[in-house]
């Protein structure tokens, strides 16, 4: 069943495999009249791209091309087609994986579902698919910027290390998108240890949105938080999502968790900017739990396509963690959810 | 924007307010030929209904009526309309709340979004809306039972108390749907303390599904886990969702979190039955963090509709926790997600 | 597959069978703040209801009840549930049809699709289903009236008789909704002849909408005319749809068919108010071809459920033509299409 | 609002403007395991391509590239991205049209809707957009061929000339896709007259589908005929759609129009293969009325973007009629509708 589209009014459809000729996205429903150039998108793609020290050495340039929907530098209201051609494709690295199921990956589930799979670098299930999401998110960002909405994602935990302080300016200064410089330094040391050990790690990404008006979200199934949860959980390595106080709220008392209302607004934001599925006007705050990358060089038990036991040690170009590359992806998903809701009119009739 | 429908093939649309004449659901896409009687639905409604000691004393009978889609005791493939008339409606209890915004509720966000709100018992944002979900879930259960799929929800944490053991048979023996009798007894004591204190609490609900075939879920946005996350987060009091190891996975190493594959299947289930968004054939395991019920008699700071500060102490019939009533609701949402995916054919062409 | 919903923003879901307990519709996405009373809906239902001389003698009162979405006389933005209980249900009339397939009806296709069918009066495939559409259309009409849009349907051909003149005031003065009094009188004589002959007839319904702004319709698949065509063709007896000059345009020259543009607007309206799928601001004009009612007392050849040949003469309460009852139904479908598009914001960004 | 997607299970999204860098389509939901090569698609594209004598002299090669969804020559179940780069783009031809609204085109409605338009060759509203539909239809054809379904479109009327005979083999032998060789010859003469006169013409296209099983179509809004009507009316120049006897049925008696049922099946096919919105198993027959191409060199009255009157004579490369190029497009739309319904399982539960 078709599952590669997201959004109702600001609607995207992504396509492409890790080692196919190209990948891309069609954005349908973007309003006309928004200035848009490839550089607007390229900037965001650079933030998730491999080639940095932390991430895999695949030197993919990730040049985006705009194939439709923009005329004389401005969106026209028709579908915007973005494409990124895959240039550094070395499928040869993967031929030995054609007949083995990597633990923690979708190799076996894809084969069970489709009866066939593209085993080159994970095919459609590769993290590379998220480049298309980031490209679409960049377009959503342009639209939202014009409405005063700003979205920022950052790392709040990595390999069990947590941030202790929050400095917004620090986020783009370190390779972890971490708002705490001290924590970032510790994370860097942790990466080296894990690389030496042939192992990998996960972490927690937080996304916050400023400037959203009250009133976004549609009861009862398309609540703002429901859509955010679905959006973030659709990102490959994400295994948990929470809004505001999240899982901590489960252990709080009502008198602790309720955000008091004052004539100046809410006195706290345990709600994470969402009440009854509708935005309150406070910052929207969501967090995503990211599992460790399953590709490790440490030996693992698995089976091959004939069902025989195999000991597998995955070589090749792999990251130690989906963080930091997943950070701009989480940001993109929140941008896309908000763009979708922001497109809807305030439907109140004048009386 | 329309937001009261859920699902693509097994599609439900709910309607109704807490203190309106009735509430209900239309189930469109349920296969024909399934025996269905009101009692099949009534049984599940009883599990979430008020009137038990733990929950609010509203003595609503919640009698479901089947108005369409069933002929001679069997579904016909046409829409099934279920309705529950509200009989014990005392809106008078709420008139004093018509001009005040209750903290932690949707009173203010609804008014900001719609410019008008039904203040009787929360109107559409009331937990009562979930009766329609449970009714629809009961129909999904009938369909899934014929395919060998079984879904069960239970409480794993309540007011900071956690279960230590798991006994499936115990779940329906205590009012908390708790699989640990000792923990259930402690929870019961906690309820009394909170009621005396005029406060409320939350908890964590786990849902597990047995018997699902591998192959459910549609990459990349309609992944099984993405749909589960959106479904559970759409339930009123839920602020977090996790699959399998969930947030714990964020602090694990790849070598710990990966589920090894053996000739006999997966050796563990940190994935919670989902890899790359597609079911593995293992039990599907999801958890939802439930916030404390915001209606408490303990005094709170808030404002009225004129923006003036008010100290509010909420009287009337209110539960101490959304647990246990939310347990069958979480179960229903997972049933509905699975019914939707189970309706889709295995689309593989013979070669 | 679920197929009983229509519209994207102003979204309706209908349910109910001819001889079940009730039928109804859920309207999701209707803006808040619109005054709405049962009489607003009842008025439209009266226009399609049986009991008039022309139509079948089933004396169904068709009383609509509003079960949700309206508070203190005004829509709240939440789903509006409308129900009409079936009171004059004499299924006994149909028991002899349980084992025979009526020509021109859906008896056999429903059974082939679903493996089961509700044979009482056509079940879900009965024209009675359209009462729910008319009820929903009445709500759309209230919304559109506030935006200055007015929709009117009328009969332009009946049993081969065509209207020669157009008098808008005449439409509601004769039982055919015919804008030509002379033609209406001829139609009345034709009905008597056909009733005597035990036969039935069809005709053509035209729907025109005044006051629509330019800009409605979404290229390339959700064009305004594409949605109108799908909407009208979804009405049971409709076998053809055309916009503006329609089929006549197929035999015209470009120089004849093009509507010249002048500083005062379009000089003609062969386009029927739609160019490139987008409304022009001129009247929107659509026509639907209605086939003769298949239930006739004249003997017909058919087969029973065992495949044996049967000569069938259908007795009971049946209309001679779907006209006039189908006229308000076509009107409702156009109302629903326009409400859906009118809900969408003009998305142009200010530059 | 997003409007460039079509279908629910076999879902396509098209993009691209007449004179942009490229146009294309993403096909999401195509089953895995279907052999697919560029030539399978190229063959259908050739049938609609310009360059033949009848059509405009734009020598576009229309080479399709498959960018995703196919691995080792076989579909994988993931989205199939097809792209056609525009090579023969002479926008200069259109600069004089940047400030004038061509009658019968979408120039003015696009500008009214979006506030901006791509005036190069009609931009998104150009007939060139349909190349993407034909490419997607070719993939649907591959899928349907495996299920025994065959779809064929042909011209039954052109400039007021009608076919008198039907010879299936003749269809691909003449440039009109006309099943009557004598009529085709007359059409050819008519084209020359119109070209000399600087005028254009329309016609009627019929599409028939063989081999469809009974049971396709979803009551009550997604009826097979409703979807066909919406699909065909979404094609640029189409102004009318009919199924089976269509508009002629409006003047028939019930006793004439009903298709008698015999032990060997239906004795006639006035229904066009659809009863109550569900396929009967007979050939599905639909017709589309095609308006004359609005671009004519004969002088026309119009206005420019400043609202001033202009006499316009359109030069450049234009067809005399949308026929024959629209014939493969109508065929593609029916292929896409049928593929969508054929993907759905027969949902009957065994009892």
Swiss-Prot record, chains A, B, C, D:
Entry GO CC: cytosol
GO terms assigned for molecular function: chorismate synthase activity; FMN binding
This protein's record includes keyword Amino-acid biosynthesis: yes
Cofactor(s) for this UniProt protein: FMNH2
Catalytic activity: 5-O-(1-carboxyvinyl)-3-phosphoshikimate = chorismate + phosphate
InterPro entries, sorted: Chorismate_synth, Chorismate_synth_AroC_sf, Chorismate_synthase_CS
Enzyme class: lyase
Pathway listed: Metabolic intermediate biosynthesis; chorismate biosynthesis; chorismate from D-erythrose 4-phosphate and phosphoenolpyruvate: step 7/7
Domain of life of the organism encoding this protein: Bacteria
Annotated positions binding FMN: 124-126, 276, 291-295, 317
PANTHER family the UniProt entry points to: CHORISMATE SYNTHASE (PTHR21085:SF0)
Family statement drawn from the similarity comment of this UniProt entry: Belongs to the chorismate synthase family.
Subunit structure: Homotetramer.
Function: This reaction introduces a second double bond into the aromatic ring system.
UniProt-recorded name of the protein: Chorismate synthase
Taxonomic source organism: Syntrophobacter fumaroxidans (strain DSM 10017 / MPOB)
Highest classification ranks of the organism: Bacteria, Pseudomonadati, Thermodesulfobacteriota, Syntrophobacteria, Syntrophobacterales
């Amino acid at each position: 069943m078709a599952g590669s589209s997201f959004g109702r009014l600001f609607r995207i459809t992504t396509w492409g495999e890790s080692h196919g000729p190209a990948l891309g996205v069609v954005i349908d429903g973007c309003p006309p009249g928004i200035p848009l150039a490839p550089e607007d998108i390229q900037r965001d793609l650079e933030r998730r791209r491999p080639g940095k020290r932390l991430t895999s050495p695949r030197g993919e340039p990730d040049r985006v091309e705009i194939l439709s929907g923009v005329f004389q530098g401005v969106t026209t209201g028709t579908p915007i087609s973005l494409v990124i051609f895959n240039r550094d494709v070395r499928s040869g690295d993967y031929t030995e994986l054609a007949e083995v199921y990597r633990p923690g990956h979708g190799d076996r589930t894809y084969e069970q579902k489709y009866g066939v799979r593209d085993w080159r670098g994970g095919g459609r299930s590769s993290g590379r698919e998220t480049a298309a999401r980031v490209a679409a998110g960049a377009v959503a960002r342009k639209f939202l910027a014009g409405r005063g909405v700003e979205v920022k994602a950052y790392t709040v935990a990595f390999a069990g290390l947590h941030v202790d302080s929050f400095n917004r300016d620090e986020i783009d200064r370190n390779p972890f998108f971490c708002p705490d410089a001290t924590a970032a330094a510790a994370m860097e040391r942790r990466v080296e240890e894990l690389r030496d050990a042939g192992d990998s790690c996960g972490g927690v990404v937080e996304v916050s949105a400023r400037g959203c008006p009250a009133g976004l979200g549609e009861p009862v199934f398309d609540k703002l938080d429901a859509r955010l949860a679905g959006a973030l959980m659709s990102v490959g390595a994400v295994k948990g999502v929470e809004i505001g106080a999240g899982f901590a709220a489960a252990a709080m008392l009502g008198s602790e968790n309720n955000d008091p209302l004052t004539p100046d607004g809410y006195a706290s934001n345990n709600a994470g900017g969402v009440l009854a599925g509708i935005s309150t006007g406070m910052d929207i705050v969501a967090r995503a739990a990211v599992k460790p990358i399953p590709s490790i060089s440490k030996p693992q038990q698995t089976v091959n396509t004939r069902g025989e036991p195999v000991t597998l040690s995955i070589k090749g170009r792999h990251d130690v963690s989906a963080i930091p590359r997943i950070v701009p992806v989480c940001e993109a998903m929140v941008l896309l959810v908000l763009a979708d809701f922001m497109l809807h009119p305030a439907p109140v009739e004048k009386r």
